[in-house]
Amino acid sequence: MIETIAPIFVEEFEKHLLPVTFSESLPTGADVAEEYFRLLQHSWFDSIDGGDLVSASEVLHEHAEIKHYRVWTGDQNQAEPFELISGKSNILLWLQQQRTRLAASGRKHLVKTVLVGNHEFSFRAETIAGQQQSACFIGWIKLRDQLIYRYTVVPD
């Protein structure tokens, strides 16, 4: 019975796999991961942590969308456990609304791992407040025109 089911399962599974191509002209995975790390850590999180929200918003596509799940379980300052913000100008406004709370908490965002795909990547990061408090989260980012187009963050 298993011998007949397994090939059917494999065929069905393979239908959903994306075609893979390799090219010598493509940058290595390490180069792309480093580029995406810089985009995420330095251009996005460091700008947010430093209060430079306009610089942070410069890495966003005009039609960007953020899906943000509450990372700190005890964080009652975030209005909702889940927030969906669409459009670069609305995201900048949302960041400005969050800035006072983030500054008061002293939180910093630290990217730990970046996994690279084709115009998208996932990451694992930690947000730290003071010496003792931290919360890990994971995220997924899709790029368009080398800018953040889709950004989803959930607790780890």
Please describe what each predicted stretch is:
Residues Y36-R38, E65, S86-G87, Q133:
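Intrinsically disordered, low-complexity regions enriched in Ser/Pro/Gly/Gln/His and often acidic
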Residues M1-E62:
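Short, low-complexity N-terminal intrinsically disordered segments enriched in polar/charged residues
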Residues Y36, W44, A56, L60-H61, ...:
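Hydrophobic beta-strand residues in large extracellular and virion-surface proteins
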Residues S47-I48, Q76, Q98, R144:
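Short, isolated positions within intrinsically disordered regulatory regions of eukaryotic proteins
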Residues M1-S25, R99-D156:
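A beta-strand edge to alpha-helix "cap/lid" segment located at domain peripheries
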Residues S55-G117:
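A solvent-exposed, acidic/Ser-Thr-rich amphipathic alpha-helical stretch
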